[in-house]
Amino acid sequence: MFKDRKDAGIQLAKKLIGYKNKNVVVLAIPRGGLPLGAIVAEALNAPLDIVLTKKIGHPLNKEFAIGAVSLQGKYVADSAEATHRYIEEETRRIRKILRQRQDQYYKNFAPKILKDKIVIVVDDGVATGSTILATVSLIKEEEPSKIVVAFPVGSSSAINRLYNSPFIDEVVCIEVPKHFNAVGQFYRNFNPVLDKKAMQILKESNKHFIVSKYE
């Protein structure tokens, strides 16, 4: 059980300290992964960026991911209990949100270059692994030297899926509970991270690393 995302981020950073001052870029999955990603990036003396992916929630439990969407593609779990119509409607809705976030987050700054970098993908927890798997499939196209996925808590089934991914080099997880329903149950405080706060975190974290897209 974690007190909040700050507590989880501090504990996660300790697990990743071996990457300090290496050729690392920390990628947070917004919005929940950003508070943790900022703590990890600071501890490792690394720049922080985001990945524009968002989960497709189960029709009866939006917090439980049955897939994930990016601007370029989507991933849906084989066991997803949802209609094709629901998946397509959610995909359109989510892509609209992602385009808005792209405009907001990258209004003045360019995304980090990932080629030949050690990329550490951070989220606040993993229920199915769908979001991270979709994320990693996009990251791999940018030819990083290594991909690490890191999160405080995850289901055993998700951990197995991530370990079996040919694109993931290392999985770092603090807790793998026997009984797992949703990520939020393992936080005392799991309040949502609003876009305004997320953008502030990203800006503050990158004061020494940000490169303007106009340079």
Regions found by a protein language model. Give the residues of each.
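PRPP-associated nucleotide enzymes
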Residues: 1-215
